[in-house]
């Protein structure tokens, strides 16, 4: 992924107070909620103005055609007081490259406590798909609902990783009928309706996954085919690994390698 700097240069002398700075924070927040930047953005003051240090999922993310109505609204407010420009700084080595497939044949909803990339994974290359490339769902003009689910999942995963409320947190990630899973499955269904491509939900398991789908009880093990998941139920739109490859805090390398690797 790419590190960028957005420079906000005051058009005239201004005080950096809530009235002048808040539109910048709103602009950055809307870029994040639309999937155009990652959440690790920072605003820095210097002698010539303000810098926003941001991470983009790809080089196209800041193009005006990718903005939603909220990004455009707050960018216009920012430009009342500032000239705005962006500069490529280099590759952010903390993150893998995003999916560049033209038309993925299927998608997967997946995240864990280590990941800050998009929770939408391309089923062909196994890399994260920038959210701004996907249609808005759940009667929203941004992707905040998807990002909210991701935040809830990551919080649950952190609690489970540190052995807190084990039974509750494990069930939330493992049971397709838990509230967290049902929310995720609803997101998958909404995307599939909009995109017209299969959208699968990833089920976590810290032990060997059973050979039968937990919903329809059919054999969902993948035989022979090379893929980055071991189980896949086309009917129930679920995927899983033999054993989920996380849960021990020894390495922060994203799981999305395995294709996801």
Where are these regions (language model features)?
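Cys/His-clustered metal-coordination modules, chiefly Zn-binding fingers
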Residues: 178-261
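Surface-exposed cleft-lining segments at the edges of enzyme active sites
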Residues: 170-176
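Domain-scale terminal segments
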Residues: 1-170
């Amino acid at each position: 992924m790419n590190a960028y700097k957005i420079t906000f240069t005051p058009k005239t002398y201004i005080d950096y107070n809530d009235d002048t700075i808040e539109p910048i924070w709103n602009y950055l927040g809307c870029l994040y909620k639309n999937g155009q930047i990652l959440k690790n953005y920072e605003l820095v003051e210097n002698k010539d103005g303000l810098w926003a240090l941001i991470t983009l999922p790809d080089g196209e993310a800041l193009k005006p055609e990718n903005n939603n109505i909220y990004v455009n609204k707050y960018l216009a407010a920012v430009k009342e007081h500032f000239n705005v420009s962006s500069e490529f700084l280099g590759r952010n080595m903390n993150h893998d490259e995003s999916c560049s497939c033209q038309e993925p044949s299927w998608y997967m909803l997946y995240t864990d406590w280590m990941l800050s990339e998009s929770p939408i994974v391309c089923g062909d290359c196994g890399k994260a798909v920038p959210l701004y490339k996907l249609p808005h769902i759940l009667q929203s003009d941004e992707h905040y609902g998807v990002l909210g689910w991701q935040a809830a999942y990551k919080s649950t995963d952190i609690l489970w990783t540190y052995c807190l409320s084990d039974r509750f947190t494990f069930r939330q990630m493992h049971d397709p009928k838990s509230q967290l899973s049902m929310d995720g499955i609803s997101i998958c269904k909404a995307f599939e309706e909009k995109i017209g491509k299969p959208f699968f939900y990833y089920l976590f398991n810290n032990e060997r996954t059973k050979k039968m789908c937990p919903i329809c009880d059919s054999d969902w093990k993948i035989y022979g085919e090379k893929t980055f998941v071991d189980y896949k139920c086309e009917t129930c739109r679920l995927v899983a690994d033999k054993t989920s490859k996380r849960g021990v805090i020894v390495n922060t390398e994203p799981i999305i390698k395995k294709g996801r690797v």
